[in-house]
Amino acid sequence: MKIGPVLGIEGTAWNLSAALFDDDLIKLVSHPYKPVQGGIHPREAAQHHASVITSVIEEVLKGNPTPVAVAFSQGPGLGPCLRIVGTAARALALSFDVPLIGVNHCVAHVEIGRFASGFDDPVVLYASGANTQVLGYLQGRYRIFGETLDIGIGNAIDKFARSKGLPHPGGPEIERIAKNGSYIPLPYTVKGMDLAFSGLVSAAKDASAPLEDVCYSLQETAFAMCTEVTERALSQTGKEQLILVGGVGMNKRLQEMLSCMCEDRDAAFSVPNPQYLGDNGAMIAYTGRVMLESGSVLPVEESRVNPSYRADQVLVTWREEPSGSERHPDAYSARGAEAIVRFCDGAASKIRVSKRYRHPELDRRLIAERTRAEARLIAEARKAGVRTPIIREITQDTIIMEHIDGVKLKECLSPELLEETGRMVGKLHAAQIVHGDLTTCNFLVHDGKTWLIDFGLAGTSSDIEHRGVDIHVLFQVLESTSKDSDILKEAFIQGYREKMPLADEILNREHEIELRGRYL
């Protein structure tokens, strides 16, 4: 049955945009807010949206069929901007006497990417001004596998650009300048499936190197971080398709890195047409249309905007569970996101492999640093009572250690094993060791006991924040891969409290970290 065209209105931040979408895009009109100087001013942006929204919508509707529904960006975003769009959408829906549909902005980026690529079950890197997230579909929702712990990559780049007096938006200008640059070392912050950009931006601002070198290195470092956590998500989920969405996705170097990584993993990669990458009304209209087909409409009285609306809060009624999604097979069981593991004579050799997408100097630095740190911290964790493999030999890129003949925790999740895992992590944190990558792939189960492996991102810290981030990584993985995540998290917490005196303070911090990611 033919649905008919849906009107979509986007206005979460910079761009006021509207579109009409039927089986394909009919018309798209955008009118972005451009500040005189500095970054976005929410009230000024809202005033801009209010001043142009009527003309933008009139231009979209002129000469086209009357929409059968009105969709609008309900969140996340800037409250003043969202309220302008929400008010207009309600008025139009009542005027046309058609259904109203509230669309999650992040989910809309994912759905327009799926439409443009034809991919069915991809991992999605969403890289924009305010958001940096790696998402994928599981059990009726889009799960967030990893995300920024501080600011979005686009905002990070724009902050650096403003500090150097570069015009807005800063991303294209930095990309242009970077073409003539050379690499200089800058901070690289990846914490399991999450990442952080504030330290990188601060170091780039303070760097005394030529501007072209700093721009080049800022891109090389930030985009390598994004590519690394995206590869982890592909490895963790066993998915074989990747889509890049969001305004930062227009950067050719980021596209090149992701394409290179996917080629090495035999994964398919797609980037939508530029008109679908940044914030746009087409993604709202298209997502509204698929939601309308599944009956996901809003009564006007329940259409309040939500500035903190996360993608994983949306019940995805318009998709079916892909076949095999319960198993999440990892086609790279012998080759994870960072290393190849070879087994021989009761030993496991973990060999860190070079990544073609990373700058060679950065690649060598990370391999050497992570190999040395891993060997040292495995030994320290073992002294603290944590079950880890015994180290036998170390080289520049290889650790030879005892082979633990077990299965990954992700393949046998249970409350009993998560409670045991909590006790183990409690011992680790009590010894002031932070693992840095507490995913369910890095716990092995052998004879009913859990063993902790892969200390490549580990470090020492007595900081509450660092230990909270450690647990946040694990909780994110549980939420994105298990329908019983709440039960499993409670079991972990019970075990953790047994061994970690500061457990409540750390767990409260983990909750604060989760809330920070609502809209950054």
UniProtKB/Swiss-Prot annotation:
Places the protein is found: Cytoplasm
Reaction(s) this enzyme catalyzes, per UniProt: L-seryl-[protein] + ATP = O-phospho-L-seryl-[protein] + ADP + H(+); L-threonyl-[protein] + ATP = O-phospho-L-threonyl-[protein] + ADP + H(+); L-threonylcarbamoyladenylate + adenosine(37) in tRNA = N(6)-L-threonylcarbamoyladenosine(37) in tRNA + AMP + H(+)
Binding-site residues for L-threonylcarbamoyladenylate, renumbered to this chain: 126-130, 158, 171, 175, 251
Binding site residues for ATP: 333-341, 350
The EC number(s) this enzyme carries: 2.3.1.234, 2.7.11.1
Gene3D superfamilies xrefs: 3.30.420.40, Phosphorylase Kinase, domain 1, Transferase(Phosphotransferase) domain 1
GO biological process: tRNA threonylcarbamoyladenosine modification
Enzyme class, spelled out: transferase
Region of interest called Kae1, as start-end residue ranges on this chain: 1-318
Entry GO CC: cytoplasm; EKC/KEOPS complex
Major localization class: cytoplasm
One Gene Ontology term of the molecular function aspect: N(6)-L-threonylcarbamoyladenine synthase activity
Subunit structure: Component of the KEOPS complex that consists of Kae1, Bud32, Cgi121 and Pcc1; the whole complex dimerizes.
Function comment: Required for the formation of a threonylcarbamoyl group on adenosine at position 37 (t(6)A37) in tRNAs that read codons beginning with adenine. Is a component of the KEOPS complex that is probably involved in the transfer of the threonylcarbamoyl moiety of threonylcarbamoyl-AMP (TC-AMP) to the N6 group of A37. The Kae1 domain likely plays a direct catalytic role in this reaction. The Bud32 domain probably displays kinase activity that regulates Kae1 function.
Name listed for the protein in its UniProt record: Probable bifunctional tRNA threonylcarbamoyladenosine biosynthesis protein
Organism: Methanospirillum hungatei JF-1 (strain ATCC 27890 / DSM 864 / NBRC 100397 / JF-1)
